[in-house]
Amino acid sequence: MDGTATIEELVRGSLDRCVKCTICETACPVAAVTPLFPGPKYAGPQLERFRTGGPSPDRSLDLCSGCGICTHVCPHGVKVAEINALARAAMKAQRGVPLRDRIVARPATSARLARPVAPLANALLAAGWFRALLERSLGIHRRAPLPPFAGRSFQAWVRRRRPRALPRAVVYFHGCSTNHFEPRLGRMTLEVLEHNGLHVAVPPQGCCGLPLQSNGLLGAARRYVRGLAARLAPYARRGYPIVATSTSCALMLKREAMEILGLEDDPDLRAVSERLYDVCEFLLLLHERGELRTDLRPVELTLPYHAPCQQRGHGIGKPALELLSLVPGLRVVESDVECCGIAGTYGVKREKYDVAMAVGEPLFRLIRDAGADAAACDSETCRWQIAHATGVPTLHPIEILHRAYGLAPPA
């Protein structure tokens, strides 16, 4: 390929490096628990060789969770997950996108509609009869982990707060989950960053488009991610670091929007991707430069820690694990399990819930066997899945650092 090839062409071109070694199929968490999915190689690179005259995706691709493990383990650099994501989108374009998928792909819209009546909406989500109705009418599994709506968004809290004047500045990309479901995490993130001498700017920001992309709505996903990048790009061009607490949303801006949505030429997205850090990655960099405060109090806790699938796509290792090792008294149990099964909106769907739970069972067993009072994970949907399956409160690593710094818990 010449220098004018698009990233999508490079992704598709990578399939020629596939030697059918089946390493991706061995690592695939979905293929391990259901015979209905033949594995990422068969559904993607292998069948791609026989497709002519346009896309003809295999229907089994609907069971692919999009976790990205196949791309990570491929020894030849084949973009297996990205090829399969493009094929899933083509399949949705041919067959149509169900109403259920259109709804779960827009969590911010649902949250804004529910916010004025959040107590009532949350009571309905907790009612068995209402969840049974959702399952029958929309196909959202009655036991799927659905987070409660926040009565006030994180952005609303930020607007009423007086920022601290500190010598250095960062920008916080909080994502939809923090804004609409976990504003408490956003508040703790700000306080940890400020405790380390950083002024935190929180510009208005929308959805990154990842749920839309995952559900085959690529046109809408492009509009969303371009809008978000336009909001953040002025800060990136001025040299400010942008830190994120959502592993998957950050990966969308760093790589997936370019490789799957074909936005490699978007100047705003390029600028943002070059200045974007996972929050634990950023704090670990501060520590390595001797700039992270280490006035950490003991936290006497046994804490299983699970690194989410999307973190591998960042290529940053496990920075949260290294940060947690700084906390006195904390006994971290590192998970070697690949996936919790939820994969964003995948595991909430009626036909995929049991597959998602089966994928995550080794992780759930590890956490239950640890007898822990809490667990930790960087990704929001993974936290909700782990807490749902085990009954163990599951925290973002920032929440542990917040406690270790002796900062007052948000009301």
Where are these regions (language model features)?
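Iron-sulfur cluster-binding electron-transfer modules in prokaryotic oxidoreductases
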Residues: 80-411
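Short, intrinsically disordered, charge-biased short linear motifs at domain edges
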Residues: 3-15, 50-61, 193-196, 325-329
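Non-heme iron-sulfur electron-transfer modules
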Residues: 1-7, 30-60, 77-103, 392-401
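Short, glycine/acidic-rich beta->alpha junctions
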Residues: 6-10, 66, 223-224, 359
